[in-house]
Amino acid sequence: MKQLLLFCALLFISCGSKIDQEQLHLLNGYWEIKEVTFKDGTKKEYSVNTTVDYISLDSLKGFRKKMSPKFNGTFETSNDAEPILIRIANDSIFMNYTTDLNTWEEVLISLSEKSFSVKNDQGITYTYERFEPININP
């Protein structure tokens, strides 16, 4: 009986955390990395970031761009952008990136209005929080 209850609890938890394609619009915007969890369980936390990621998705395609926030609430950036292609398979959402130098894939493991996490093929999990620009000008 205990095994059945444990199985049902795990099933409920795993079903409740599934990310729906309708939620992908939440990825649009500015994000800063907060934590990296390595395969062995060790973590690295980031309290201050000199760059943030800007993500723009339209349907299942988009891009990610590195931005440098300034103290007046604006950003500096380059013309470089990493194309993103979203792939949905086996009830999972994958973010595929291709640049001139590399190709990689991350699985989206959590997504909300305030944060998201992805895991790469090396077992490293990246957790991001929504970035709020700082404006010190009155």
Label each PLM-derived region with a short phrase.
Residues 44-90:
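N-terminal glycine/threonine-rich, aromatic-flanked beta-hairpin/loop signature
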Residues 27, 54-63, 88-92, 109-116, ...:
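Short, solvent-exposed coil/turn segments at beta-strand boundaries
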Residues 81, 119-138:
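Edge beta-strand at a domain terminus
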Residues 103-126:
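Short, compact, well-ordered microdomains
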Residues 17-32:
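N-terminal helix-cap/turn-to-beta initiation motif at the start of protein domains
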Residues 33, 62-66, 93-97, 116-120, ...:
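Short hydrophobic/aromatic-rich beta-strand segments that constitute the beta-sheet cores
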Residues 1-4:
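Positively charged n-region of N-terminal signal peptides that target proteins for export
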Residues 11-14:
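C-terminal motif of bacterial Sec signal peptides marking the signal peptidase cleavage site
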